[in-house]
């Protein structure tokens, strides 16, 4: 497969995800396919965003690392010290992605590291490992292209997260401001009763304890549900199941007390 064909295969994957979050596991699988390598896509803090490994590489330590979805802190720091592409790293180097304890299997292995950059900052690292064959110039071109594309996707996700947080904050603020004084008081007591982000509420019990009518509680919950801040489900005589949908809601509720 030519370099152009391999590049197009990566582009095709990204076009499938246009407008939605990219699955970095899919990206890792595609990179692995077109470069015939073991692949790790790692965040700047060492979280494994995506990976694709052949069975030969999966020793006990690697399997544990994949289950934790995190590489060791020491290796994360070593990767972050790499400022530009380093290619064809041998197994005796601390930067190798292959387990040194299996030197008999991976004595001829090669690791290549591509820093992932975007928006003027380091976002993570693309690590490729090959059991026997050196990385060619075409491999390096493709790897650097893949790292650039991954960087753009990470930036896009971060931007989307910031936008979503802003929308959530506005929705929470509007919902709280729409509550009357008695409804606001009712909501405070409701979440004190729940003691967390979800739980079972018996409205009459709270109403009797606080000295408000049940209708005030119902109206307050309805306003929050309409704003998308919570979801509720009646369980009949057992009460009402309530779940917070906006993570920052309880923090904001605590702030305005």
From Swiss-Prot:
GO terms for biological process: negative regulation of DNA-templated transcription. The keyword Cytoplasm applies. One of its GO terms (molecular function) is DNA binding. Signal peptide: none annotated. Residues 1-155 are annotated as: GAF domain. DNA-binding global transcriptional regulator which is involved in the adaptive response to starvation and acts by directly or indirectly controlling the expression of numerous genes in response to nutrient availability. During rapid exponential growth, CodY is highly active and represses genes whose products allow adaptation to nutrient depletion. Belongs to the CodY family. This is Global transcriptional regulator CodY. It comes from Staphylococcus saprophyticus subsp. saprophyticus (strain ATCC 15305 / DSM 20229 / NCIMB 8711 / NCTC 7292 / S-41).
